[in-house]
Amino acid sequence: FMLGIPTPEKQMKEAFSEVFGPEQSAQFFDDFVCSFCTEEDFKLLKDTGINLIRVPFNYRLFLDDQNMELRKEEGFRYFDRLLGFCRKYEIYLLPDLHSVPGGQNPDWHSDNQTGTPAFWHYDVFQQQIISLWRDIPARYRDEPYLLGYDLLNEPFLMPAADGKLQQFYERVTACLL
């Protein structure tokens, strides 16, 4: 969504791969992620007196749709790089989980391809994210410049959802403690 193209990220990546090939497409998106927050950005933030940066990320940075038990190292490398800049420039990081399996809202900017927030209909999707939120804090538990976590960006519930958001937050925060 950061490219300003109103298309779910997964569809955009598939289209790039079809046009440019899998290797070139993967390289483009790797380069994009690496250039999204640069050291120059952190220096500018520090020079202007800003001490907190909220960085969105897609669950696919850490999880593979074909094997959700697998943790992709690229997500941890991305956070490691950001936290290195945070320590150097004394800026706090607030990672923002911007998309989850099935989509937490119906919008394209959450990488939702169906327009239905299916995350709330399938416990397996919620379990995958709860598991991810177990792993990320375990790795960064002692990181002084990690301020906290935006556990789920812009959740949207249908009227019949009856407490699902509250239940999810209770389950996910329990694994953080």
List where the protein language model places each region.
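Active-site mouth of glycoside hydrolases
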Residues: 1-176
